[in-house]
């Protein structure tokens, strides 16, 4: 049997360029063979010109089979050699338009995870971070050429010390919907944010101005890498939509979307030298108590009494962090931290929707607080007026066992 090798066609070179991006998404990819079946959706997003650029690489290799330098150097070696050529469209799976000329160029910043570190000149609670979310008219199936249909974007500036410092919000005009998937978009919208898929008067089609305002809001001074945070489950969608918006705007995308769960763990690490588990942090962010709070949703969603809003999702991340970490860092809660800080301060600390992460400190509080005492005399003062405390049976065990013991005792006494 002949030794079959992967055909070095246009798709082969695209899969080669996609390897770093696939690894960034958490996929275990060791080579092109494993990357090939994972790149079909991203390949469908490329324009005809971009696909032609990869086809040209394949033709060059076919004409000169001994020349293997075009792919052996990997993504970054090829990128360095062709940095000045406008015909090089490799972009680690995504592409961007240059702000000065309307032609596709390579991505200037390779996809990578950024180490979360706080400014040494500032306390961690003074660190300013940005929470972002972008909603779509559903998650398009693999048959669709477009992965998402962006419709709403929001970003919140936040510090633990000061609370929410500002917000950015806009509705995105998705343009022409993918042909044949209008019903899919309609269903996705109706089941979540309910933003109209067409004819929406608030939808903004000035992509350049929208993206420029977002960049000015997050990073007024130029910066090669700008970290923004969202929930781990939303990272791929938000990152894809940012790339799409940057392409429409004709600008470079310097945003790097990071997990807000990692940021929260970093806050605990710096203060307590301990870190909660990731599932615990995920549960911390999974709350519904502020869905209908005032000044949380955008005006359109609030006027229409809808809780699923991109701006609200960003603000609720800030609320969760404020409520969990305020006591750890000794921060006084204000209306910039929570919609109703007085109520949050006075409510019972054992809230089923709030996860207590510092278990040792909570146990110390419980042992010293009479509310959690096992002594009935101490606990009776906390019973509602007019209600007698429940005097349970002295016996232990399951109810069925006590019932059997009672029946056996009654039979013995009657016998």
Curated annotation (Swiss-Prot):
Keywords: Cytoplasm, Developmental protein, Differentiation, DNA-binding, Meiosis, Nucleus, RNA-mediated gene silencing, Spermatogenesis. It holds the Pfam family HMG_box_2. GO terms for cellular component: cytoplasm; nucleus; P granule; piP-body. CDD domains: HMG-box_MAEL (cd21992). InterPro entries: HMG_box_dom, HMG_box_dom_sf, Maelstrom, Protein_maelstrom. Residues 4-73 bind DNA. One of its GO terms (molecular function) is DNA binding. One of its GO terms (biological process) is meiotic cell cycle. Residues 372-386 have a biased composition (Basic and acidic residues). Coiled coil: none annotated. It is found in: Cytoplasm; Nucleus. Residues 367-399 are annotated as: Disordered. PANTHER family: PROTEIN MAELSTROM HOMOLOG. Plays a central role during spermatogenesis by repressing transposable elements and preventing their mobilization, which is essential for the germline integrity. Acts via the piRNA metabolic process, which mediates the repression of transposable elements during meiosis by forming complexes composed of piRNAs and Piwi proteins and governs the methylation and subsequent repression of transposons. Its association with piP-bodies suggests a participation in the secondary piRNAs metabolic process. Required for the localization of germ-cell factors to the meiotic nuage. Belongs to the maelstrom family. This is Protein maelstrom homolog. It comes from Xenopus tropicalis.
């Amino acid at each position: 049997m002949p030794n079959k090798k992967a055909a070095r066609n246009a798709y082969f070179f695209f899969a080669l360029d996609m390897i770093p991006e696939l690894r960034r998404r958490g996929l275990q990819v060791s080579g092109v063979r494993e990357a090939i079946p994972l790149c079909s959706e991203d390949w469908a997003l490329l324009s005809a010109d971009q696909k032609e650029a990869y086809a040209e690489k394949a033709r060059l290799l076919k004409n000169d089979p001994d020349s293997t330098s075009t792919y052996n150097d990997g993504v970054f070696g090829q990128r360095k050699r062709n940095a000045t050529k406008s015909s090089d469209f490799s972009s680690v799976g995504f592409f961007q338009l240059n702000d000065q000329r309307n032609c596709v160029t390579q991505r200037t910043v390779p996809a990578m995870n950024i180490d979360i570190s706080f400014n040494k000149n500032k306390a961690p609670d003074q660190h300013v971070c940005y929470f972002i979310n972008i909603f779509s008219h559903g998650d398009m199936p693999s048959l669709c050429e477009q992965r998402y249909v962006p419709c709403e974007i929001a970003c919140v500036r936040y510090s633990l010390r000061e609370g929410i410092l500002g917000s950015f919000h806009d509705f995105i005009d998705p343009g022409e919907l993918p042909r044949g998937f209008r019903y899919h978009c309609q269903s996705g919208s109706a089941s979540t944010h309910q933003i109209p898929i067409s004819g929406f008067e608030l939808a903004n089609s000035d992509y350049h101005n929208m993206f420029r305002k977002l960049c000015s809001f997050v990073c007024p001074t130029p910066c090669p890498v700008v970290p923004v945070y969202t929930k781990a489950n939303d990272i791929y969608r938000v990152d894809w939509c940012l790339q799409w918006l940057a392409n429409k705007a004709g600008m470079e995308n310097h945003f790097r979307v990071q997990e807000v769960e990692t940021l929260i763990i970093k806050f605990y690490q710096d203060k307590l030298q301990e870190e909660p588990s990731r599932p615990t942090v995920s549960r911390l962010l999974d709350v519904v108590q502020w869905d209908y709070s005032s000044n949380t949703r955008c005006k359109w969603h609030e006027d229409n009494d809808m809780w699923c809003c991109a701006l609200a999702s960003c603000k609720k991340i800030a609320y969760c962090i404020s409520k969990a970490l305020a006591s750890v860092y000794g921060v006084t809660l204000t209306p910039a931290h929570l919609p109703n800080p007085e109520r949050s301060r006075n409510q019972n600390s054992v809230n089923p929707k709030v996860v207590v992460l510092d278990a040792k400190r909570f146990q110390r509080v419980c042992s010293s607080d009479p509310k959690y005492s096992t002594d009935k005399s101490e606990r009776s003062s906390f019973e509602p007026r007019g209600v007698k405390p429940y005097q349970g049976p002295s016996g232990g065990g399951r109810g069925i066992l006590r019932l059997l013991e009672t029946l056996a005792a009654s039979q013995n006494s009657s016998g």
